[in-house]
Amino acid sequence: MSRGLGDVYKRQVQAESYGLYQSIFSRNKGILETSVMNTKRVVILGCGSVGSLVAMELARAGVGHFLLADPDVMEYHNICRHQCGIEDVGDLKINALSRKLKNINPKVHIEKFEGIVQNLPKTMLDEFCVANETIFVGCADNRAADVYTNRISIYYTASFISIGFWERAYAGEIFYHIPGRNMPCYECALGDGGNISARAQANHHICLLYTSDAADDLTRVD
């Protein structure tokens, strides 16, 4: 009895199941457990050079849910500092960054809003935010936006962190607020006027926190 080519291949090819998701984060085990990080939710306000880097590093850490908010389009002058590239020029930053995050973790859940944080619909935040599982990250280089974001984070019992650089990277500024602790809000600590990058020199002392433990701290948001 003659055998077809298909019969030969059926015997020779052995398929093995491949756990893509588990393999992607296999090097994180014992440091950042996927089962913990996958439930975390991050709202990125401002998807520029800082916001895109923060989002991608959190995606690599295993964070499973993102809400990206930014009104801007990728332009050529963004490329030298942004995590997205020339192929993304002309598209919204939220779309370009979303593709990058999906390329790291195909199972990541992403919500997008084309606009500034002050215009984020409450219904969208209500659906996305989960108390003690959500963190707001302010990367808009705007104090008024960070003040507003911190107020929202308090409303949703979520942690808040603001990240920015002063003019010509003279210094970096990181502020964080964790609900339920005796900590000043952003407005009380830093005020609400101007852009962070417009600061040319320090006129008061701020906690400058550059640490590799930032992602690990996210696992303890509770």
Locate predicted features:
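Single conserved hydrophobic/aromatic residue that forms the stacking wall/gate
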Residues: M1-Y9, Y210-D222
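Glycine/serine-rich phosphate-binding loop and adjoining beta1-alpha1 elements at the start
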Residues: R3, D7-K40
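Glycine-rich adenosine-cofactor-binding loop
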Residues: E33-V63, D70-V73
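Short, surface-exposed basic-aromatic patches at helix termini and helix-loop junctions that form
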Residues: A59-G62, D126-A131, V147-S159, I178-G180
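Glycine-rich phosphate-binding loop and adjoining beta1-alpha1-beta2 segment
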Residues: V73-N105
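A structured beta-alpha segment of the ubiquitous adenosine-cofactor-binding alpha/beta core
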Residues: S98-E133, A140-N142
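ADP-ribose/adenylate-binding Rossmann-like module
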Residues: I135-E173
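Adenosine-phosphate binding glycine-rich loop
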Residues: I178-S212, R220
